[in-house]
């Protein structure tokens, strides 16, 4: 077993060796290095053929038409293109958008930008388990609602929203429906025909493909129109200009092909690891699981260890690569906005750790992690006067702290 152990698969995954091998074939003079937009010679034709194959592989994982796949630089760009592109195109019909407070920043920040442009955004509160109440969602819809953006799986707590039901609601009300599926693609079955989703953002590096490449699914029937955010050579049917990165696209295609074949195998593997970790920790005192445990992707576990500062625990677990919050926000010392939206107080939100497992995680690593976590938590609690007070039965909420 090699240290440190990687338990941060929700932040990114290592590239699968099979994917890396395919990518290597598209880089050098001996390989398929041409520009897919070069129509006048064989190098361009071969590159275009490789891109077309990858486009089919990406479409295949979500039961889409390859012509509905637009390649981007990743899920952040896909989210921006979907949200700003759709909102601006349909702004004559209305300027109201609905989303949720626990969305990724790549959804929340484009919404904030649209607010500066005169749009109104409703940010829904999730329930305490992280799921959205359908009645509240229905009540938020107005005459001028043009767009709804709800993520499939949350990046911090791994809960799965009922995208099929939300899709039906949006279709009934003629609202464009965007889903950020960065954390669900390749982990859960996605069928765009059954789900009635109009726009889906996906990325490659969360399912063992390379970073820097993603895609946006844009429905053709009924056709969804977008205002381009990137202008240039008119690539990707005018929706996203820029030379296509053949090696990254081929890598993404191969990662999606493998995911389709091995999705169930990966799910069973990660679920067994999560259950093992949970079984090893659940008898500890004051341990709180964040988010619904049933409606949850198998590779994620987010736990708060009360009376332990999250940052100190991260430092104590120096041989485990885990995170507090998402990778995009774990550098800040603010408590997770996702956990705050679930109603956790600052202390509990601050003491949370996200474990995420993957294809290359092992039982041996889990067993090592259990020992390390139990030792670290016990040691840190021994140093905490609050833990002593809690053990003595003092209600910490009723204590009046002196201000100096």
From Swiss-Prot:
MF terms from GO for this chain are:
2 iron, 2 sulfur cluster binding; cysteine desulfurase activity; metal ion binding; pyridoxal phosphate binding
Binding locations of [2Fe-2S] cluster:
328
Q: Which residues form the active site?
A: 328
Identify the keywords attached in UniProt to this record, alphabetized.
Answer: 2Fe-2S, Cytoplasm, Iron, Iron-sulfur, Metal-binding, Pyridoxal phosphate, Transferase
> In which residues is pyridoxal 5'-phosphate bound?
75-76, 155, 183, 203-205, 243
Tell me a GO biological process for this protein.
[2Fe-2S] cluster assembly
So which domain of life are we looking at? Bacteria
Q: Which reaction does it catalyse?
A: (sulfur carrier)-H + L-cysteine = (sulfur carrier)-SH + L-alanine
Q: Which PROSITE patterns match?
A: AA_TRANSFER_CLASS_5 (PS00595)
Its primary localisation, in coarse terms, equals cytoplasm
Q: Where in the cell is it found?
A: Cytoplasm
> N6-(pyridoxal phosphate)lysine-modified residues are where?
206
Gene3D superfamilies, sorted: Aspartate Aminotransferase, domain 1, Type I PLP-dependent aspartate aminotransferase-like (Major domain)
Q: Which Pfam families match?
A: Aminotran_5 (PF00266)
Name the InterPro entries for this protein.
Aminotrans_V_dom, Aminotrans_V_PyrdxlP_BS, Cys_deSase_IscS, Cysteine_dSase, PyrdxlP-dep_Trfase, PyrdxlP-dep_Trfase_major, PyrdxlP-dep_Trfase_small
Q: Which cofactor does it need?
A: pyridoxal 5'-phosphate
EC number(s)? 2.8.1.7
Record GO cellular component, one term: L-cysteine desulfurase complex
The SS bond pairs are none
**Pathway in which this enzyme or protein is active:** Cofactor biosynthesis; iron-sulfur cluster biosynthesis
HAMAP family associated with the record: Cys_desulf_IscS
Function summary: Master enzyme that delivers sulfur to a number of partners involved in Fe-S cluster assembly, tRNA modification or cofactor biosynthesis. Catalyzes the removal of elemental sulfur atoms from cysteine to produce alanine. Functions as a sulfur delivery protein for Fe-S cluster synthesis onto IscU, an Fe-S scaffold assembly protein, as well as other S acceptor proteins.
Tell me how this protein assembles: Homodimer. Forms a heterotetramer with IscU, interacts with other sulfur acceptors.
Similarity comment: family membership: Belongs to the class-V pyridoxal-phosphate-dependent aminotransferase family. NifS/IscS subfamily.
What is the name of the protein in this document?
Cysteine desulfurase IscS
Origin organism of this chain? Photobacterium profundum (strain SS9)
Q: Gene name?
A: iscS
